[in-house]
Amino acid sequence: MAALKGAQDIGFAEKDPTDDVEALDPRRKLVLSANLAFGVSLREDDIPCFGISTISAEDITFFREHGWICKLFTRAKKVSSGVSAFVIPTLFGITAPEIYSNVAFYGERIGKFGFSGAGTSAGVYPTGSSVLADCLDIQAGCDPFYHVIAPHPCLINNSNEMKRFYFRTQGKQFITEPICVGEAFDQIRQIQKAEPRA
């Protein structure tokens, strides 16, 4: 709780941190980005999402001992059978800047490009600037940048996304061999059912 209070004090977490620690805010941003990029109509509930609320001091110690820090990571990718999309805590090298957010895009013709900026914007200037810009656009009668697309089925398929996962169960920590994201979420549900505090 002390870490969360510290994050709120510096603007890294909202006053009500639920959207931050349960990864709901990153998932909303992922939905908007994926819908714009792929011309689909994903809903928040379609996307598997796992936050950081169950990460313990023991986990953080384990990460540091291995030279890692944990950050929320979102990914959306067009696949032949729909869209691969998920939100998960991810381990990065300890040198990764803790309070920076990064967004990377890849297009067939444009290649890879990205943006990086301070992540301490919970209710501060970047948010206020965006809200003000939206209000001015509405007042000026500008055509909205984001158009709601007529709903049509779009399958979330994470079966080809192979990652290694960190699990803590029965007081033991382990890293899996590469498994698909869907399988990892199934394992998470099973662990939480057997060990509600895991």
What are these regions (language model features)?
Residues K77-S80, G107-G111:
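Short acidic-glycine loop/turn motifs at beta-strand connectors
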Residues A13-D16, F113-G119:
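Short hinge/gating elements
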